């Protein structure tokens, strides 16, 4: 589908910043959040505030952790490390604390709005931390709990916010749906005639970002951390792939860990260490009016995404913040080192229409004078999620950056998450969606950042349809048969940068999305036909985006077997489904390992786990081991032939005997197809008889043509990722990063069948799995859930009820055309054993946008539970 045509234009670099990087606006964010100056500090001077700030001549020779960046995130990381017992922490700030973005942040404290459990918990923790900071440090942060309201002015946003509010309430956010009239009572100056509903959190509000940062820094100092201002990091030290210290103009600091919290400089800082941090600064705007007598200081924060704006009182006037749908990237070539408290000259012509639209929500603001129209840079990422975690390129080098305008909102929680991660070696929350290793190096290319950022900032206030795909910076990665799939009517979506067929339009129909919605869209019947063809006939599915590795060497089998919970070093020519676990017995990867021969293994993982899987192998293979990992993803196309007639079709194009006797389930063997050779593996992710073909990319078009021609007589149909989702969900197949994640025990995830506790040599995480088994019946389990009513749709984060009580939420879902309703996988938690009796004795329901629907819950696959169809 087409988003605004302007998305197709490359974003321009803006060079309208004021000439002096040190210069800062006299207004800043008004009296509440101006850039810090000595007179703002009750102790009588910025440097004098921190008694432990050292002169460069007294630079510490070593520290356990060096945090680079003194904004909200850097000080929060230091604060939490120190409070968790790691007191030998040094924060390096190249200028002064809060410089860059923190000083001009809006200071909103909002817990509502996310359908990520991790993000919601970080928001809640952050608010709670800010509430207690003053008592701990003696420094006020200006936290005013005046409340927060987001309004829905159209049906789709109402649907979205009802879905979000149900999930947020489950997570402990006290959000209430209110009428437009009630919105007007809470914010009397707002126009409410078109508002369908508002969503109100009384305990949320606003605070001063500068004071929050200073309080966190003081709290860190009180626990023994050191804060150094005016000390830039000019280089990284490392030894054999492990960080060893930081270079400064005044000498080096040896360090066991380095944390890059450099905000919009994080990409440039990462480059010094060879670490990829793909984020980009963009223009971000707000306007402050002259004083409005009718405006009271105690008004709640108001947000209206359909008008591009958020609103709060500021110094007697109205602050109008903007997230325009098409933004302007700033300084593609790099943020200047001395741009600390600077402003960008605002583009009135570009922003005028958006500003007009936003101010119409508060009509009185249109007649008020303009006190300040401010533009400052803020960093955004390609998928609007943070960049967090240990860098795959350099061990013990951590990053927390690219907060996409939620740095203050999640700052406390982000610091806690990263501190726990560093100290314990692994995180205690789901980080699959924000881990730095999800990105690839090309996403830091200037053209990519310029083009994608035009769209990404605007996504903050777009309606977050679950089927939406980013439209910019596309076309870089295509499979070898892309043109042939396009000719078949493929509608492509962004799949980790690849062009992945989502669904196929029938002949004569343009593959476009006519209208995004939460309901059945124009492509729904095309998807249904692909699903049914897989269950009844045969389909071709391009999965070339999957991560593929060839692992070779005399010790390759033993090392892979140690990483794998299942036995993967058995007979040659056999594929094995397995998980990789950490020492705590929770999941790190979900993949297949195929033994080609005693010294060659074929490892296949999901696209999102690509770099994580590669890094996991490299980090766990001893340096002197005779084992070598080669990423062959781009070298091989993956074409899957699936369905009851798949054997019949493939047998027409190969001389290899594919009978059930000669080529049973889990067999892997090289076969001939036309003039090509392909690795053929009998396996399925769709719940039917099927085969995966791995073909050298240069031969893939030839193989495709042979299969397509032979398929004409057996009704071959092409199928896309929508069908993949619905078919695998009916079967209850897991997808790491969607319905299972790094917080799940392999047993809780329902994958105990893929664990071999008795194999010689054991495996990484075995002791934790045994300990989990010893605890007795599981009280937390992944359960398949089917909505009995065929009409509603599930996507993610719908709350599951048992006997009227919330017991979990849907992690991922699709529509089960064979089962006759929406179907998903939910992690259920209870104070008792979750077994068949627990399921049978429950009255199950799912909340979908505020309405509850009867449901069926099952521990066994609802489709073909006896696995007969895949082994026939």
Q: What are the residue ranges of the model-derived segments?
A:
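Central beta-strand plus flanking loop segment that forms part of the substrate or channel wall
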Residues: 106-111, 148-150, 274-297, 353, ...
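Extreme N-terminal leader/targeting segments of oxidoreductases
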Residues: 36-65, 83-87
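Flavin-dependent oxidoreductases
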Residues: 76, 110, 117, 235-345, ...
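Glycine/proline-enriched, intrinsically flexible loops and inter-domain linkers
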Residues: 429-430, 436-872
């Amino acid at each position: 589908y087409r988003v605004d045509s302007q998305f197709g234009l490359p974003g321009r670099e803006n060079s309208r910043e004021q000439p002096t990087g040190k210069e800062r606006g006299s207004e800043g964010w008004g009296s509440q959040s101006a850039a810090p100056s000595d007179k703002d500090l009750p102790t009588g001077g910025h440097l004098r505030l921190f008694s432990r700030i050292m002169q460069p001549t007294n630079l510490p020779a070593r520290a356990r952790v060096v945090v680079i960046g003194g904004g909200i995130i850097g000080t929060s990381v230091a604060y939490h490390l120190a409070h968790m017992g790691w007191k030998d922490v040094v924060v390096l700030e190249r200028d002064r604390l809060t410089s860059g973005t923190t000083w001009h942040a809006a200071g909103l404290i909002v817990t509502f709005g996310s359908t990520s459990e991790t993000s919601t918990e970080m928001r809640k923790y952050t608010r709670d931390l800010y509430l207690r900071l003053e008592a701990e440090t003696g420094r006020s942060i200006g936290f005013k709990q005046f409340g927060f309201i987001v309004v829905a002015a159209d049906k789709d946003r109402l649907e979205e916010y009802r879905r979000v509010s149900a999930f947020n309430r489950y997570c402990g956010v006290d959000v209430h749906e209110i009428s437009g009239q009630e919105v007007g009572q809470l914010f009397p100056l707002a126009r409410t005639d078109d508002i369908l509903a508002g969503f109100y959190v009384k305990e949320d509000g606003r605070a001063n970002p500068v004071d929050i940062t200073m309080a966190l820094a003081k709290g860190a100092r009180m626990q023994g951390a050191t804060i150094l201002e005016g000390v830039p990091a000019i280089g990284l030290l490392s030894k054999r792939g492990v960080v060893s210290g930081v270079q400064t103009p005044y000498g080096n600091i040896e360090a066991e860990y380095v944390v890059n919290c450099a905000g919009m400089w994080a990409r440039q800082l990462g480059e010094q260490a060879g670490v990829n941090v793909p984020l980009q600064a963009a223009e971000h705007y707000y306007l402050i009016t002259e004083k409005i007598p009718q405006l009271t200081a105690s008004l709640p924060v108001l947000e209206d995404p359909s008008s591009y704006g958020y609103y709060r009182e500021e110094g007697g006037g109205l602050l109008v913040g903007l997230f325009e749908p098409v933004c302007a990237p700033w300084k593609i070539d790099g943020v200047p080192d001395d741009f600390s408290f600077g402003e960008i000259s605002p583009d009135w012509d570009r922003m005028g229409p958006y500003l007009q639209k936003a101010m119409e929500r508060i009509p009185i603001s249109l007649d008020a004078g303009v006190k300040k129209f401010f533009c400052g840079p803020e960093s955004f990422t390609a998928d609007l999620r943070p960049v967090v975690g240990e860098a795959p390129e350099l061990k013990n080098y951590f990053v927390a950056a690219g907060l996409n305008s939620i740095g203050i909102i999640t700052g406390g929680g982000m610091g806690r998450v990263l501190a726990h991660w560093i100290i314990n070696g692994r995180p205690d929350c789901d980080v699959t969606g924000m881990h730095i290793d999800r990105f690839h190096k090309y996403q830091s290319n200037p053209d990519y950042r310029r083009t994608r950022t035009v769209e990404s900032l605007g996504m903050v206030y777009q309606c977050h349809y679950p089927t939406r795909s980013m439209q910019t910076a596309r076309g870089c990665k295509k499979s070898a048969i892309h043109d042939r799939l396009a000719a078949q009517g493929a509608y492509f979506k962004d799949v980790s940068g690849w062009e992945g067929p989502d669904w196929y339009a029938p002949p004569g129909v343009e593959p476009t999305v006519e209208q995004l919605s939460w309901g059945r869209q124009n492509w729904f019947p095309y998807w249904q036909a692909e699903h049914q063809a897989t269950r009844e006939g045969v389909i071709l599915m391009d999965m070339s985006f999957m991560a593929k590795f060839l692992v070779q060497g005399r010790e390759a089998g033993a090392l892979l077997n140690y990483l794998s919970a299942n036995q993967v070093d058995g007979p040659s020519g056999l594929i094995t489904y397995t998980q990789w676990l950490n020492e705590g017995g929770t999941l790190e990867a979900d993949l297949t390992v195929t033994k080609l021969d005693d010294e060659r293994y074929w490892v296949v993982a999901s696209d999102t786990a690509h770099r994580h899987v590669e890094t996991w192998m490299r980090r766990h293979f001893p340096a002197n081991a005779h084992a070598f990992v080669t990423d062959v993803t781009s070298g091989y196309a993956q074409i899957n032939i699936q369905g009851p007639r798949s054997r019949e079709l493939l047998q027409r194009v190969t001389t290899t005997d594919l009978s059930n006797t000669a080529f049973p389930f889990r067999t892997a063997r090289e076969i001939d197809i036309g003039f090509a050779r392909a690795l053929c593996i009998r396996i399925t992710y769709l719940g039917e008889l099927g085969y995966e073909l791995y073909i050298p990319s240069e031969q893939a078009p030839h193989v495709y043509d042979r299969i397509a021609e032979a398929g004409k007589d057996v009704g071959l149909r092409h199928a896309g990722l929508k069908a993949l989702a619905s078919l695998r969900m009916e079967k209850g197949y897991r997808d790491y990063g969607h319905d299972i994640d790094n917080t799940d025990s392999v047993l809780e995830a329902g994958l105990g069948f893929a664990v071999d506790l008795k194999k010689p040599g054991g495996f990484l995480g075995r002791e934790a799995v045994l300990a989990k088994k010893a605890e007795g019946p599981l009280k937390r389990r992944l359960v398949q859930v089917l909505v009995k009513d065929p009409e509603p749709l599930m996507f993610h984060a719908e709350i599951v009820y048992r006997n009227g009580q919330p017991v979990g939420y849907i992690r991922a879902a699709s529509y089960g055309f064979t089962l006759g309703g929406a179907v998903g996988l939910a992690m259920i938690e209870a104070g008792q054993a979750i077994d068949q009796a627990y399921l049978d004795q429950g009255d199950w329901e799912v909340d979908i946008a505020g309405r509850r629907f009867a449901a069926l819950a099952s521990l066994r696959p609802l489709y073909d539970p006896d696995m007969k169809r895949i082994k026939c």
